[in-house]
Amino acid sequence: MFTASKLLALLTSLFATVLLTLVIVAPRGEADTPSIDSPSVDKVDFRLLHEAVSGHQVVDGRYQEDVLGVASTIPASLQPALKGTKFVNGCHPWATKELGSCAFGTYDPEGWDSDDTHGHEWTNTIWVSSQAVRTGKASDVVLHEVGHAVVHNLFDDCYFPQQAEVSVKELLLQSFAHGGANPAELLADAFVVAFSVHSDDLHTHYFDDFNFQASKEVLLKLRAAVWLCSK
């Protein structure tokens, strides 16, 4: 049974949610949702990448068309964060060095190499491993990495109404605070839950490893943040 205080808290929460989802933001540029260019195989020059990447045989390319096929299904609401982003089938050089193995996916806005230098040819890339494709997890891996891109490109300088003192990024990271897990990785996993077109056996590595679940309220807040910050 609801007590009066619990009912008041619920009504306050619902009212805040309605305000969050209905807030009107002055659009910049065209009113239509901007979209990334349709990915194409020739966007990635694998010969140059092979020559540029130091220390590891990391660029695969055998499943490049599969990766681009998955990239073409990214929801339109997330695409404003992906302007100029290229998708690469392979193992990111810096992540490979750090992990000692090939990461399923990596988002790299700065072009990091295994020698800890950055600014290389693969700046603003999302890498998807061949294993992610072979195991049928590429779509979830891509959404996770796109989540990192959204947080990096859209949430850092965006603010919820009446909460202008703290960025959307920081507010959302607070919702994913955890004693053992990196909240940024948990937040990226939440994009898989919130935006995946399938619901069976989602690949949410960090949620699974740390037995973490995002509440419906947090997922609603995440969707509202994407809507707000992509305008």
Model feature map: region roles:
Residues 166-231:
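Metalloprotease/metallohydrolase-associated module, dominated by Zn2+-dependent proteases
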Residues 92-139, 152:
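Active-site scaffold of zinc-dependent metalloenzymes
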Residues 57-68, 132-141, 178, 182-186:
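Soluble non-cytosolic domains of exported or imported proteins
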Residues 71-79, 156, 161, 165:
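Residues that cap or delimit alpha-helices
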Residues 79-80, 117-122, 182-186:
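Extracellular/periplasmic catalytic domains that process cell-envelope and extracellular macromolecules
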Residues 2-114, 207-214, 225-231:
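A metal-dependent hydrolase signature that marks the N-terminal structural subdomain at the beginning
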Residues 126-128, 149-151, 186-194:
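Structural recognition of the beta-strand scaffold that forms the well-ordered cores
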Residues 146-163, 187:
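Catalytic Zn2+-binding segment of zinc metalloproteases
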